[in-house]
Regions:
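ABC-family P-loop ATPase nucleotide-binding domain
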Residues: 1-15, 301-305
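Generic beta-strand hydrophobic packing signal
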Residues: 12-14, 27, 250, 284
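Generic structural signal for individual residues within well-ordered alpha-helical segments
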Residues: 77, 99-100, 114-117, 169, ...
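Short, charged/small-residue-rich alpha-helical element at the C-terminal edge
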Residues: 226-298, 305
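Residues at or immediately preceding the N-termini of alpha-helices
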Residues: 73, 110, 217, 235, ...
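ABC transporter nucleotide-binding domain
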Residues: 172-261
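ABC transporter nucleotide-binding domains
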Residues: 6-9, 16-188, 193-207, 211-213
Length: 305
């Protein structure tokens, strides 16, 4: 889907103070239509605070916010939906009745409600009350609530928090479908680095209220990509061995260096195969870093934040 180059959110120099402490310090973020922008940071980094300023739930002390190219934020926020922290649901009501209440003033038809339930995989919950839903079901219902007004921009704070791997995968699929099928732009946060790397197209790393780095998905992959470095005087023979092992993703950097990008946990086996084929190996070792290591390098924090 071609989303063009429209700016959905332009936050410039956002600062939020609580007494002498700065929860946000001159944070500037620009989000284009069609992006899934992921905020990464440990608890207390400022992720929720930033989202709340965009939604108008808390004021800012410095900076400016534009939504859809306008500073008329009251009108622009009608084009947004959000699910922040604990989902605000009616625990004694069913999924359908929760959505009907949300839809009461919006002219939303029962057909549209059924479509939302189906998209969120809640169509078969029947008379089951929301208080008896699993965490994943509650999160999906909260997103359905946020979609009632058919928003163009969706803000999700920790949408996979507390979920098991199956629930996380399901939530990823739903968010990606929203972007693909409805053209929705998404801002979401997480403290699970690996999880966010599987869904976002762009990233902002927050640390102690500062935006310390922005990257695209491709740039992040390059920063955290690992490979094996093989130093040999017989690159052609080494390539033949790699081919025989079934490896295809490698780069012949020079007449002496080959970089395989797969089999990174098989360094010893690759070395053994080269030696058995009488390929002279002057050096073989793993190069690069994992996503968690990259985050640690930037923040000095805990990778499992």
């Amino acid at each position: 889907m071609d989303f063009g180059n429209e700016t959905v959110l332009k936050a410039t120099g956002i600062t939020k103070k609580y007494g002498a402490a700065k929860a946000l310090d001159k944070v500037s973020i620009e989000i284009k239509r069609g992006m899934i922008y992921g905020l990464i940071g440990e608890n207390g980094a400022g992720k929720s605070t930033f989202m709340r300023t965009i939604m108008g739930l808390i004021s800012i002390d410095e900076g400016s916010i534009e939504l859809f190219g306008t500073t008329d934020l009251q009108a622009a926020r009608r084009r947004m939906g959000q699910s922040i922290e604990t989902p605000a649901l009616y625990p004694e009501l069913t999924a359908r009745d929760n959505l009907r209440i949300q839809a009461a003033n919006g002219g939303v038809s029962d057909r549209e409600i059924e479509d939302l339930l189906k998209m969120m995989r809640l169509e078969n919950t029947g008379k089951k009350k929301a208080k008896n839903f699993s965490l994943g079901m509650r999160q999906r219902l909260a997103i359905a609530n946020a979609l009632i007004t058919n928003p163009e921009f969706l803000i999700l704070d920790e949408p996979t928090n507390g979920m098991d791997p199956a629930g996380m995968a399901e939530m990823r699929e739903i968010i990606q479908r929203l972007v693909k099928e409805r053209g929705i732009t998404v801002l979401l946060s997480s403290h699970l680095l690996d999880e966010l790397s599987q869904i976002a197209t762009h990233y902002g790393i927050l640390h102690e209220g500062h935006l310390i780095k922005e990257l695209s998905k491709e740039e992040l992959a390059q920063e955290s990509r690992q490979f094996i470095k093989i130093d040999t005087s017989a690159t052609e023979q080494a390539v033949t061995v790699l081919d025989s092992l079934g490896y295809r993703d490698y780069f012949v950097q020079s007449s002496r260096v080959i970089q395989p990008f797969e089999g990174i946990d098989q360094v010893a086996a690759i070395n053994q195969a080269l030696v058995e084929a009488k390929v002279p190996v002057d050096g073989i070792h793993l190069v690069g870093q994992k996503l968690e290591d990259y985050f640690l390098q930037l923040t000095g924090g805990n990778p499992h934040v």
